[in-house]
Regions:
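Membrane-embedded alpha-helical segments of multi-pass membrane proteins
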Residues: 3-8, 48-56
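Membrane-embedded alpha-helical hairpins and interfacial helices in multi-pass inner-membrane proteins
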Residues: 4, 39-48, 63-146
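Helix-capping/transition residues at the boundaries of transmembrane alpha-helices
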Residues: 12-14, 61, 65
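Signature of the 12-TM Major Facilitator Superfamily
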Residues: 22-23, 74
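Small-polar-interrupted transmembrane alpha-helices in polytopic inner-membrane proteins
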Residues: 24-36, 78
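Helical-face signature of the major facilitator-like transporter fold
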Residues: 29-30, 55, 113
């Protein structure tokens, strides 16, 4: 994923609905498989774990609502935790052979995925929280679709 790439899916989840964002995440995950030129799965399960689960996890950002900033923050945190857990589990299952000496599959996957995804989720969450969500809801003409 590129820097701040979760922002559009987080906004779909928060401004429209979690269901729409989950489906959008599936679509993004499928498209990413074809549009990322160097991506090659090591196992068919990786397609499910990394591309469908982790992309759709961002849809959970809208499950607490969008009427208060703390609800948006809780949703972003939940979505980030689910996404990081999915990537970490995928790392253990499919990339344990890359583990550094003495680290083991879990240690390697946690270190790798935390170093990649925590900054990504923090920056994306900060951007979404800095946006005028009330004005955006008004501009798109939606208060909440559920």
């Amino acid at each position: 994923m590129s820097l701040c790439s979760p922002v559009p899916l987080l906004l779909v989840a928060i401004l429209w609905s979690p269901k729409l964002a989950i489906v959008s995440g599936w679509v993004c995950g499928i498209l990413a498989m074809f549009l990322i030129p160097v991506w090659q799965p090591v196992h068919w399960g990786q397609i499910f774990a990394e591309h469908l689960v982790c992309f759709s996890a961002l849809g959970y950002a809208g499950c607490f609502g969008n009427d208060k900033r703390w609800k948006v923050l809780c949703g972003i945190l939940l979505a980030s935790v689910i996404k990081i857990c999915g990537h970490t589990l995928s790392g253990v299952l499919f990339f344990s052979q890359n583990a550094w000496d003495g680290w083991g599959a879990w240690g390697y996957s946690l270190a790798y995925n935390f170093s990649q995804n925590i900054p990504l989720c923090l920056l994306s969450g900060a951007i979404v929280l800095a946006l005028p969500l009330g004005s955006l809801k008004h501009a798109i003409g939606k208060e909440r679709l559920a």
